[in-house]
Amino acid sequence: MPLSEPVPRQLRHRRAIRAEAYERGDGLWDIEACLTDHKPRDVALASGIRPQGLPIHELWLRVTIDRELNVVDAEASSEWVPYPGQCQSAPPAYRALIGLNLFRHFRRDANRLLAGVAGCSHLTELCAVLPTAAIQAFAGDVWNVREEGGEGPDHDGVHAEPPFQLGRCRALRFDGEVVRQYYPRWYGASRPDLPGEGSTKE
């Protein structure tokens, strides 16, 4: 259902975050995230006036992953920044993401490696969207999310486990209507120790 009707108001700032996933010709996947900040007016920054229409920030983060969600390459780019010539020193630090796994405590580890002066606060924010973007990209493509289940980042090839997505949000709880209607085989099941539980929610 939509949000309630707002009181009269005026747009002062727009931040947009988007993520896209690409299957590559070499069998790997690229997960890209972009953050932009705009103001609907000229803005006086410490470095000068930023005219209306030009972004305050336009930041990019790309990780290349295999089908087990291991990060095999990473790069960042600061296209528009409030401190030109200075903010661009941060992107090389994001090579530190190589070797992490998007499903296993990625947000915690990315924050440990890149928080504060180790990186750019906004690029580090973008790290948070990568795990679920990858999971959404893999669902129904790399992983089977239908009733038979048995696939996901920790699957063993035997359909003894429910579909990856079950038990990970309120709508998909095992005793809920969605599972009863669409995944009856798993209705009422319990899975106390979900692989990776919490790792995509940190």
Task: Give the ranges of each region predicted by the language model.
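Short, Gly/Pro- and small/polar-rich lid/capping loops
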Residues: 1-42
